[in-house]
C-alpha cells in the first residue's frame, strides 16, 4: 500500500479527533471532504463525488479516496443544509498563509457547527430562538439550561421531587431546543429522549459525567456570568449549576472562540411563569396549527405584528412564558394601554422600527469574530434609527416605557465610528479589500493611490529627480530584469548624484537605481497585498472595538425588542377591538362577549358569535357543556383558555370586558389531537393525559376537558367521566376551574348534586327538519344530541339518514332512556352473527343520546351490513 501524503496524514489526525462531525478541510479556496464524509456530503448536498490518490507513488490498481468540495466563500448555505438535517460540521482552516508557509500548511479546527450552535443567518429563523439545551438529572432532582448562541440569551431553571422529569419536559416546550446535551441520568430516561426526538426533532448526545462536574461547572459559571449571577443560584441544589456547566463545557469544546456576548443569566424558579405541558401548547395552537404545523392560524400569527426580528423573538418568548405575578402583568399591560391611547406616537414608533436590523444577532456575530463589512453597515443602519425611537418613547409617561427610554442608548459613538471607517457598500469578503472608506486612513489612501496611478507616481518622481539633479534627459523606465530604473544619457552622467547606484551601462548612457526608487517599486508591486492586509487589520480592530461594547448594544437591542413587542400588542388590540383585562388573584374568570382570537380572523363568510363566561372561586367553578359536535363547544373552551393566557401575557384580550384571576397552569384534553404513532390506543392516550392532568393540576389551574371517556364502552366511559368530573369539582380533592364538554347527558344531573357545578349548552335553532348552530353558550343542558342532524350535515347518504330517524323514533317510543338507566355493562351491543330479529333487539338496547356522531355513524353502517346479509 502506498505511503500516505503529509496532507492526508494531517487530515486523518484531525478527523480522528472529530469522528462524529463532517470535516470541512480547507485546501486553498475550497473546503474538501474525504472518504465517508465525502460520500455522505455528496449525497446530502448533491455534490459531484470524485476521488484522489491517497498516498505517494500510489499504483493505479490501488483504491482511491472519495472526495468532494465546495467553495469556501459559499460554505454558509451548504453548512445550513447539513445542520438542518441534524449533522455536525467541523470547520478546519489554514492557520498560516500557504504562500509563506514552510512545508505543510498548519491547519486546525476553528469551530464545530451543530444544530444548537448555529450563528449564521442562513441557518436561522429570524423570529425564533435557536437553543442549545443542557439537562442534568439525578435521584434528587434536575436542572435545565438553555442558550441561544446567536444572541447570548441564557436561561436556567431547576426542580426537585418526583415530578422533576415532567417539569423539565414542559420547559422543553417553552424553548423547543435544536440540540441537547444530557447527563448520564438524563440520557437514561427514555421518556425524555423520546420527546426530544419525536416532538422537537432535536439532536441530543450523552455529555457524560465529564462535562457535568460540579466544581468545574461553578468555576465556569463564575467566569462566564460573574459572581453576582452565580450567587443567585440555589445553595444546596447543585442540579441547576451542573445543567449550565454541561452546556458551557460543550460550547467551549465546540466553539473555540470568545463567547463574551453570553453575559446575562436569567435564573427562574417554578412559580414565575404559567406552566404549560406539551398537550396544552399543541391543543391551544399557540405557535403552530395542529394540522399543517404552520404559524398561520396560530395565536402567534394573530399577535405578532412586530417589525424587528428581535421584537418577534421577544413576543414569542412572552407567549411561551405567561406571567404569574399580577404586578408584572400590570406593568406590561399598562405599557400596552399607553401605546393604545396615543395613536400618533405609536404609529411613529412602529414606522421607526420598520426595517431595523437584528442588533442582537449582529452583535453576536461581531463578538464571535465572523461578522463582515455588511454586518457592520447593517448595525450602523439600525443604530441610526435609535435617536428618533428614543425621542418618541420619551413622550410617554407610563412607567415601563419611561424605563425603556432610559435603557435605550442611541450608540452615536459606535455608529459614527462605523460610518467613518466602512464604505457604504462593502464587499462580501473582508479579506479582499475595498472595505475601508476613502479618507479614513492615510496609508490605505496612499497605497490605493499607488495602485490606481502607478505610472503617475513614477512620473511625479521623474519630474522631482529632474528638478533636483538638473538633468533634463533623465527618465524612469521599467523592465522585467531590473524592475524600475533611472536612465541618464552620457552627456549628463557627470551630474549624477552619489546616492545613485549604477545597475547597467549602455552605449548611450547609464542606468541607476536609488533606495527611494526601490522602495517605491516595492510599494507598487506589493501595494495590492499590503492594502488588503491593512484594510483587514483596520476592520478587525473596529470589529473588536464594537465587540468591547457588546453589553451596551445588547441592552439597547433588548429595549428595542420590548418596545416592538409592546407596540405589536397595542396595534393588534386597536385593530381587533380588544379590551384591557382586569387581572388579580381573585380566582374569578369573568368574560363578557369573549371571542376566539384566531377563529374570528379566519372566518370569511360569517361573523364570530361572542360568548360570556363566568367561573367563580366557589360558585360556577365547573361548567358541564353539552350539545352536538360542530356546534362550537371546543372552540368556546379553547377561547376561554386563550383569553386567560393572553391576559397573563400582558396583552389585551378579544372581549368587551374581562376579569381574570391568575391561573397557575392550563391543561387541555381534547381528543381531536390524539397521536397514535406510539402504538397506544385512543383510549390509552386519553387516560394517560387525564392522569397527568389530575396529578399535576392545583386548585388554581384551568382545565379544558373534552369528551372524557369517549374511547371505551358507554358505561365505562360514563363512569370515568363522572368520576373525573367529581374529582375536579370537589375542593377536597382538586377544586380547579373546569370546562367539561360531554355527550353523556346523564352527567348534567350533577348540577343538582355537585356544589360549584353548572350546566351550559350550545343553542340550536330548528328550521323544519334542518338545524342551525347558533354558536351561543346558554345556561341549561342540551335537550338532545342532534347526532342524526350532524350525520346529515356531514354528507351521510339520505337513505341512511332517513332509516336512522325511523330507528330513533322506535327507540324514543320505547322510552330508551329509562331502559339504559337500568341496564348493566354486560348488555353491550354485539354485531357478530346476528339475525334480523337480533339486529332489532340491538337497536332497541341502543341509546343514541350517549353516542358521539362518529359512533352513531359506525353503528348505523354495521347494522345496515347485517340487515343486507
For each of these PLM feature ranges, what is it?
Residues 141, 212-222, 274-278, 286, ...:
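Amphipathic heptad-repeat alpha-helical coiled-coil/stalk segments that mediate oligomerization
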Amino acid at each position: 500500500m502506498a505511503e500516505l501524503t503529509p496532507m492526508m496524514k494531517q487530515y486523518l489526525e484531525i478527523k480522528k479527533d472529530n469522528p462524529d462531525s463532517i470535516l470541512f478541510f480547507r485546501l486553498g479556496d475550497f473546503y474538501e471532504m474525504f472518504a465517508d464524509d465525502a460520500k455522505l456530503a455528496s449525497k446530502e448536498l448533491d455534490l459531484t463525488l470524485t476521488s484522489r490518490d491517497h498516498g505517494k507513488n500510489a499504483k493505479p490498481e490501488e483504491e482511491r479516496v472519495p472526495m468532494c468540495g465546495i467553495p469556501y466563500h459559499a460554505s454558509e448555505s451548504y453548512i445550513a443544509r447539513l445542520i438542518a438535517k441534524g449533522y455536525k460540521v467541523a470547520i478546519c482552516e489554514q492557520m498560516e498563509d500557504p504562500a509563506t508557509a514552510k512545508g505543510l500548511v498548519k491547519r486546525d479546527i476553528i469551530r464545530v457547527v451543530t444544530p444548537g450552535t448555529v450563528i449564521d443567518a442562513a441557518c436561522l429563523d429570524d423570529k425564533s430562538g435557536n437553543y442549545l439545551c443542557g439537562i442534568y438529572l439525578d435521584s434528587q432532582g434536575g436542572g435545565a439550561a438553555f442558550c441561544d448562541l446567536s444572541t447570548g440569551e441564557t436561561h436556567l431553571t431547576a426542580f426537585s421531587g418526583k415530578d422533576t422529569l415532567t417539569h423539565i419536559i414542559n420547559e422543553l416546550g417553552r424553548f423547543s431546543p435544536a440540540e441537547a446535551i444530557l447527563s448520564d441520568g438524563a440520557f437514561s430516561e427514555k421518556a425524555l429522549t423520546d420527546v426530544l426526538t419525536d416532538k422537537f426533532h432535536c439532536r441530543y448526545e450523552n455529555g457524560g459525567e465529564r462535562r457535568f462536574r460540579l466544581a468545574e461547572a461553578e468555576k465556569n459559571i463564575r467566569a462566564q456570568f460573574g459572581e453576582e449571577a452565580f450567587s443567585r443560584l440555589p445553595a444546596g441544589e447543585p442540579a441547576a449549576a451542573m445543567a449550565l456547566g454541561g452546556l458551557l463545557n460543550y460550547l467551549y469544546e465546540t466553539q473555540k472562540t470568545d463567547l463574551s456576548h453570553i453575559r446575562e443569566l436569567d435564573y427562574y424558579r417554578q412559580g414565575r411563569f404559567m406552566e404549560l405541558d406539551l398537550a396544552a401548547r399543541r391543543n391551544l395552537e399557540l405557535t403552530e396549527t395542529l394540522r399543517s404545523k404552520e404559524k398561520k392560524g396560530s395565536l402567534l400569527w394573530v399577535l405578532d405584528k412586530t417589525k424587528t426580528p428581535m421584537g418577534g423573538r421577544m413576543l414569542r418568548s412572552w407567549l411561551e412564558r405567561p406571567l404569574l405575578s399580577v404586578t408584572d402583568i400590570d406593568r406590561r399591560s399598562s405599557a400596552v394601554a399607553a401605546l393604545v391611547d396615543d395613536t400618533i406616537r405609536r404609529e411613529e414608533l412602529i414606522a421607526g422600527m420598520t426595517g431595523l436590523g437584528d442588533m442582537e444577532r449582529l452583535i453576536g456575530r461581531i463578538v464571535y469574530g465572523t461578522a463582515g463589512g455588511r454586518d457592520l453597515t447593517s448595525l450602523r443602519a439600525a443604530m441610526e434609527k435609535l435617536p428618533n425611537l428614543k425621542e418618541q418613547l420619551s413622550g410617554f409617561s407610563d412607567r415601563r416605557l419611561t424605563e425603556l427610554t432610559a435603557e435605550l442608548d442611541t450608540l452615536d459613538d459606535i455608529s459614527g465610528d462605523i460610518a467613518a471607517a466602512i464604505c457604504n457598500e462593502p464587499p462580501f469578503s473582508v479579506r479582499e479589500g475595498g472595505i475601508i472608506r476613502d479618507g479614513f486612513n492615510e496609508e490605505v489612501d496612499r497605497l490605493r493611490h499607488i495602485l490606481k496611478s502607478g505610472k503617475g507616481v513614477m512620473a511625479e518622481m521623474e519630474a522631482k529627480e529632474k528638478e533636483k539633479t538638473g538633468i533634463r534627459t533623465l527618465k524612469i523606465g521599467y523592465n522585467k530584469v531590473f524592475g524600475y530604473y533611472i536612465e541618464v544619457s552620457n552627456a549628463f552622467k557627470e551630474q549624477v548624484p552619489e546616492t545613485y547606484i549604477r545597475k547597467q551601462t549602455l552605449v548611450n548612457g547609464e542606468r541607476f537605481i536609488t533606495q527611494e526608487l526601490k522602495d517605491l517599486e516595492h510599494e507598487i508591486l506589493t501595494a495590492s497585498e499590503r492594502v488588503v492586509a491593512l484594510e483587514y487589520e483596520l476592520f478587525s480592530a473596529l470589529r473588536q472595538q464594537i465587540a468591547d461594547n457588546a453589553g451596551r448594544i445588547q441592552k439597547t437591542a433588548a429595549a428595542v425588542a420590548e418596545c416592538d413587542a409592546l407596540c405589536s400588542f397595542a396595534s393588534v388590540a386597536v385593530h381587533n377591538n380588544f379590551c384591557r383585562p382586569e387581572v388579580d388573584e381573585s380566582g374569578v374568570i369573568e368574560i363578557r362577549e369573549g371571542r376566539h382570537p384566531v377563529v374570528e380572523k379566519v372566518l370569511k363568510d360569517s361573523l364570530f358569535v361572542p360568548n360570556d363566561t363566568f367561573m367563580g372561586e366557589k360558585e360556577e367553578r365547573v361548567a358541564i357543556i353539552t350539545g352536538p359536535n360542530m356546534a362550537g363547544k371546543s372552540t368556546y373552551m379553547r377561547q376561554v383558555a386563550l383569553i386567560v393566557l393572553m391576559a397573563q401575557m400582558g396583552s389585551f384580550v378579544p372581549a368587551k370586558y374581562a376579569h381574570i384571576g391568575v391561573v397557575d397552569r392550563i391543561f387541555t384534553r381534547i381528543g381531536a389531537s390524539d397521536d397514535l404513532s406510539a402504538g397506544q390506543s385512543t383510549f390509552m392516550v386519553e387516560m394517560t393525559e387525564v392522569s397527568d392532568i389530575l396529578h399535576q393540576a392545583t386548585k388554581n389551574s384551568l382545565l379544558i376537558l373534552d369528551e372524557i371517556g369517549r374511547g371505551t364502552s358507554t358505561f365505562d366511559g360514563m363512569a370515568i367521566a363522572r368520576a373525573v368530573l367529581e374529582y375536579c369539582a370537589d375542593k377536597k380533592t382538586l377544586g380547579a376551574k373546569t370546562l367539561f364538554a360531554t355527550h353523556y347527558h346523564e352527567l348534567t344531573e350533577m348540577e343538582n348534586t355537585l356544589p360549584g357545578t353548572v350546566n351550559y349548552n350550545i343553542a340550536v335553532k330548528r328550521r323544519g327538519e334542518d338545524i342551525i348552530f347558533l354558536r351561543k353558550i346558554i345556561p341549561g343542558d342540551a335537550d338532545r344530541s342532534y347526532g342524526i342532524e350532524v350525520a346529515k350535515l356531514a354528507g351521510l347518504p339520505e337513505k341512511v339518514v332517513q332509516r336512522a330517524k325511523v330507528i330513533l323514533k322506535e327507540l324514543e317510543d320505547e322510552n330508551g332512556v329509562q331502559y339504559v338507566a337500568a341496564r348493566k355493562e354486560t348488555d353491550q351491543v354485539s354485531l357478530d352473527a346476528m339475525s334480523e330479529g337480533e339486529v332489532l333487539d340491538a337497536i332497541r338496547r341502543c341509546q343514541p343520546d350517549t353516542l358521539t356522531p362518529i359512533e352513531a355513524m359506525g353503528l348505523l353502517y354495521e347494522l345496515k351490513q347485517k340487515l343486507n346479509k
